[in-house]
Swiss-Prot record:
Disulfide bonds: none annotated. The gene is traE. Keywords: Conjugation, Plasmid. This is Protein TraE. InterPro entries: Pilus_assembly_TraE (IPR007973).
């Protein structure tokens, strides 16, 4: 009888140990799954927004944005740099500099200061009218084609066809303008 009770106790203890081990493994796996889900909710949750003045909603997350958002930001950056006059150029360029990474601001400040100096000295007014926009959201690349009209003093406007490429990056909830370049389309 004593031998049977001891065997039964060992069997119950073994079953309890196996049951507790299974519970621990399940608990650990549920905690890992919860951790992954919490990370995704924190960093990849998209918020849909329809800004004032636009009729197209866009979605942004902590580290990414959709094509509509990138297009709207690129058009805003184009307006800040190209839709200027001798009175508004400083404020527009200062607003644009807020979206340039701090490490690259000095280089861009020099470029914008040269542009502002020419605009003020020659009493230039300019306006950019986009004709087409292409967006590659996976690369943060936006290509904008359009017509830049430039008035020097009281003269008739000069018209140039322009093609700009903007590279936008979204990191930790902040949108950065990594590149604002102009390309020359080859005449065919």
């Amino acid at each position: 009888m004593e031998h049977g009770a001891r065997l039964s106790t060992s069997r119950v203890m073994a079953i309890a140990f196996i049951f507790m081990s299974v519970l621990i493994v399940l608990s650990l796996s549920v905690n890992v799954i919860q951790g992954v889900n919490n990370y995704r909710l924190q960093n990849e949750q998209r918020t849909a927004v329809t800004p004032m003045g636009f009729n197209v909603p866009f979605a942004v997350s902590q580290n990414s944005a959709d094509a509509s958002y990138l297009q709207q930001m690129a058009l805003s950056f184009i307006a800040l740099r190209l839709n200027v006059s001798s009175e508004t150029v400083d404020a527009s360029h200062q607003a644009l500099l807020q979206y340039i990474r701090p490490g690259a601001q000095n280089q861009m400040k020099v470029i914008l200061a040269e542009e502002a100096k020419r605009i003020k000295n020659d009493n230039v007014n300019s306006a950019f009218f986009q004709t087409s926009v292409r967006v590659w959201p996976q690369y943060g690349r936006v290509e904008i084609h359009g017509v830049l009209k430039t008035w020097i003093g009281d003269s008739k406007p000069f018209t140039d066809i322009k093609h700009y490429i903007l590279i936008l990056k979204r990191e930790n909830g902040v949108t950065w303008l990594d590149n604002f370049g102009e390309t020359d389309d080859e005449k065919k």
